[in-house]
Amino acid sequence: MKHDMTISWDRHLKNGNVWGVEVELSMQETPGDFYTYTVKVYVVAPTQALAQYIVATMYPDYEGIFVDDEPTRTAP
């Protein structure tokens, strides 16, 4: 199948459709020892709410999700 159009990462950035999202995930090395580490994820989505939903779906065992207030305009 031949596609009619390609939307590049740069175009998504220019249009304000890339959101930075920090995800706190728990890690357990031994019983009773809990650690949290943070992962920064960049998501293509038209809204902040959809970006949060996508990340919550990708990381269902998250401890916390923090979406940037504004879309990312430059490449990470």
Per-range role (PLM):
Residues 1-26:
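Short N-terminal "domain-start" leader segments
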Residues 26-35:
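Short, cysteine-centered beta-strand-loop-beta hairpins and adjacent loop/turn segments enriched
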Residues 8, 40, 49, 74-76:
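Serine/threonine-rich, low-complexity intrinsically disordered segments
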Residues 34-47:
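A short, exposed loop/beta-hairpin motif centered on an aromatic-Gly-Thr core
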Residues 13-15, 45-49:
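A short, structured loop/turn motif at beta-sheet edges
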Residues 2, 6, 58-76:
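Short, mixed-charge low-complexity intrinsically disordered segments
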